[in-house]
């Protein structure tokens, strides 16, 4: 089990970012600095859990449009284009905001609402498994898988 191989860790702080192309982009929380433990966790999840993902469909490939060679390779190999070296951890906060004025207002509102959150560390202590029946349905949580703790790690050593 992937989760049992990790101890809880912290992302030192988060920043608010607008990711993607302007009209199709979205606001998200992203790590303020690179977090190696987060990268190790992502790689373990992608590689060790690949057998459990749904098969890649032709429409999934078409939907991605123009991808770099690395992203296209990731898509065919792992089922998603932004994994491994292309991975960027983010917590999505909004949908796409086409109107530039509204985008600026939403950004200002989020910065104000998140003042205490952006400087605080984010503790990562579990993986949560989600499923989606189809592209038109929301994701639903299936299971929360806690990381090991120091006592468990010492017992295994």
Language-model-derived ranges and their functions:
Residues 1-157:
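Histidine-dependent nucleotide/RNA phosphoesterase domain, centered on the 2H-phosphoesterase fold
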């Amino acid at each position: 089990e992937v989760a049992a191989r990790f101890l809880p860790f912290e992302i030192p702080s988060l920043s608010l970012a607008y990711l993607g192309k302007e009209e199709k982009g979205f606001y998200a929380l992203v790590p303020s600095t690179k977090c190696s433990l987060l990268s190790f966790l992502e790689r373990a999840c992608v590689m060790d859990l690949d057998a459990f993902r749904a098969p890649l469909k032709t429409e999934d490939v078409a939907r991605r449009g123009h991808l770099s060679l690395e992203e296209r390779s990731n898509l065919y190999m792992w089922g998603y284009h932004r994994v491994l070296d292309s991975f960027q951890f983010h917590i999505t906060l909004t949908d796409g905001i086409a109107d530039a004025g509204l985008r600026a207002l939403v950004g200002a509102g989020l910065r104000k609402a998140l003042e205490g959150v952006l400087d605080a560390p984010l503790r990562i202590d579990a993986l949560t498994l989600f499923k989606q029946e189809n592209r038109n349905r929301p994701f639903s949580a299936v299971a929360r898988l806690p990381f090991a703790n120091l006592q468990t790690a010492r017992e295994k050593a």
